[in-house]
């Protein structure tokens, strides 16, 4: 009697490749990266200016833009298996980061680099959606 192991082999290969991808993502998250545990997040990338207070009555310094990443709770309609009490997480993204600094220079590039899909951009805000666990600089 002959058995067809094709389906089983494909399943094993699929599981192996998923495990390999998970290891790669964990390696990307090594170092100064913040590892985001929720498997699905709606992430908002935004820029905001702030004024540094002058010292000694000197001239006011120029406004500096600080890049921040804020991850809101998952979209429950798309992912009903995710609990609604997922806390928002935030991380400051800096050009001086030692990890993937070239990627951090562009928020949209960083969004796509880590597997996020840009949904739309408005008023300097890039809304991204992720189906996988990801990390940020």
Swiss-Prot record:
GO terms for cellular component: membrane. The chain crosses the membrane at residues 36-52, 113-129. Keywords: Membrane, Transmembrane, Transmembrane helix. It is found in: Membrane. It comes from the Eukaryota. It is a multi-pass membrane protein. This is Putative uncharacterized protein YKL031W. It comes from Saccharomyces cerevisiae (strain ATCC 204508 / S288c) (Baker's yeast).
């Amino acid at each position: 009697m002959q058995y067809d192991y094709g389906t089983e082999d494909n399943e094993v290969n699929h599981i192996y490749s998923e495990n390999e991808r998970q290891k790669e993502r964990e390696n990307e998250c090594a170092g100064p990266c913040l590892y985001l545990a929720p498997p699905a997040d709606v992430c908002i990338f935004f820029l905001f200016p702030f004024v540094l207070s002058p010292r000694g009555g000197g001239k006011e310094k120029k406004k500096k833009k600080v890049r921040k990443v804020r991850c809101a709770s998952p979209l429950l309609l798309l992912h009903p298996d995710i609990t609604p009490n997922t806390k928002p997480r935030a991380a400051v993204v800096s050009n001086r980061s030692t990890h993937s600094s070239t990627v951090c220079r562009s928020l949209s590039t960083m969004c796509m680099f880590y597997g996020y899909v840009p949904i739309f951009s408005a008023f300097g805000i890039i809304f991204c959606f992720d189906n996988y666990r990801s990390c940020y600089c």
